């Protein structure tokens, strides 16, 4: 039998926990990238370890591995669905690199939160036209 691995990303609080709905549109690429970086390993599930609550929350996993991720979890995917997520992740990365090279650092499709500690230096507002 092949060795099975669980990938764990530790977060201080549950605020850092992301799910598949944020991964598919490219808003959270970290967990898919972690799995992709371990192609030579049989990663059966990817979990967040929430330090403050001492809980583990499943983010992604192989649907057939129900001892590691519930089949009801939106992140429980069939092999082909995981491959598609990885393909989409690669496309998002290419798009982000192209934007960076073009000098586009916009935070689309989201807006900067009022509570963001970087909002004073972030380009979260539309460019203002100034008369010179």
Which functions belong to the PLM regions below?
Residues 1-132:
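RecB-family 4Fe-4S metal-dependent nuclease core
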């Amino acid at each position: 039998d092949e060795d099975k691995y669980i990938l764990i990303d530790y977060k201080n609080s549950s605020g850092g926990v992301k799910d598949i709905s944020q991964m598919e549109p490219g808003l959270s690429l970290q967990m898919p990238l972690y799995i992709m970086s371990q192609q030579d390993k049989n990663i059966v599930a990817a979990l967040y370890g929430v330090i403050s609550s001492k809980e583990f929350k499943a983010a992604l996993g192989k649907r057939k591995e129900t001892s590691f991720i519930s089949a009801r979890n939106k992140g429980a995917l069939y092999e082909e669905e995981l491959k598609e997520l990885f393909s989409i992740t690669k496309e998002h990365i290419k798009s982000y690199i192209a934007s960076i090279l073009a000098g586009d650092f916009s935070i689309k499709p989201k807006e900067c939160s009022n509570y963001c500690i970087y909002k004073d230096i972030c380009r979260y507002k539309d460019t203002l036209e100034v008369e010179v």
